[in-house]
Amino acid sequence: MDLWVVILVGVLALLAGVALGFFIARKYMMNYLKKNPPINEQMLRMMMMQMGMKPSQKKINQMMKAMENQTK
């Protein structure tokens, strides 16, 4: 085979691999976020109420800030 055919096949295979990897990773992340949604203020408020605590806005803001700092 000619050199340009080998290079063309290699580039096409690389592009196909990148595209396929992107879509597989996107599908995986969408399924992951559907099963494990990120915690928002409303969910935090419900958790505190279930634990018997009275959720004040100040406590919720502190807990949200603590979770944001923990993920950094």
Swiss-Prot record:
Disulfide bonds: none annotated. Its main location: membrane. Keywords: Cell membrane, Membrane, Transmembrane, Transmembrane helix. It is found in: Cell membrane. This is UPF0154 protein BLi02038/BL02936. It comes from Bacillus licheniformis (strain ATCC 14580 / DSM 13 / JCM 2505 / CCUG 7422 / NBRC 12200 / NCIMB 9375 / NCTC 10341 / NRRL NRS-1264 / Gibson 46). The keyword Cytoplasm does not apply. NCBIfam families: PRK01844.1 (NF002503). The keyword Transmembrane helix applies. InterPro entries: UPF0154 (IPR005359). It is a single-pass membrane protein. One of its GO terms (cellular component) is plasma membrane. The chain crosses the membrane at residues 4-24.
